[in-house]
Amino acid sequence: MEIVSMREMLKAGVHFGHQTRYWNPKMKPFIFGIRNRVHIINLEKTLPMFHFALSELKKIALKKGRILFVGTKKAASKGIKEVAINCEQFYVNHRWLGGMLTNWKTVRQSIKRLKDLEIESKDGTFSKLTKKEALIRSRELFKLENSLGGIKNMGGLPDCLFVIDAAHENIAITEANNLGIPVFSIVDTNSNPDGVDYIIPGNDDAIRSVNLYLKSIMLTISKINNQNSLDKVFIDTKNSTNIE
């Protein structure tokens, strides 16, 4: 059964690209035509490419791999966080910090600092400080949570990235490429598809389109997580029975 249909994609405006003057010629194979000086994306290509991407994400989830969702612009920020949390995965939905992947050792130190501050904010340490010092630490905590809150429990580099807007998140994609981490991305007509392993040609600006992609991914991965949980319960029950 298909997670998403052509009709749903049309309704969500997935086929609307950018104005023709902003196009990237490398996206030509995925363009159906032009309407009112706007490129129209060929959904007959998008639909199977999206379903293929979903099947590959499904394989990663089955192996309990780490999926890092990246979407820092307004249209994607909220949805990226919600889907990652629902899928028990990880996210970056504010500014991408240069070196977030390629300088993981330093990022890990910042994550440790974030966790230390979280403990201090709850165990009464802040209340023992001067108002000025407590304010400084609260601001530091807020800043670190915004930047690293979505990856603080990742425990290592991700097994793949899922990106909304390849052009906007080009630094993240470059870092993943340098480390050999597979990249899944929504790629609009103004973007360069180079560096994206699993291209999904589509509108990356409209909230309805972005939400459709994310909802489909959430449905796919949530089913896998539920299956993994059921398998764990079955194994635990079996082991318990054997012990008895």
From Swiss-Prot:
GO terms for cellular component: cytosolic small ribosomal subunit. SUPFAM superfamilies: Ribosomal protein S2. Coiled coil: none annotated. GO terms for molecular function: structural constituent of ribosome. Transmembrane segments: none annotated. One of its GO terms (biological process) is translation. Keywords: Ribonucleoprotein, Ribosomal protein. Disulfide bonds: none annotated. It holds the Pfam family Ribosomal_S2. Belongs to the universal ribosomal protein uS2 family. HAMAP family: Ribosomal_uS2_B. This is Small ribosomal subunit protein uS2.
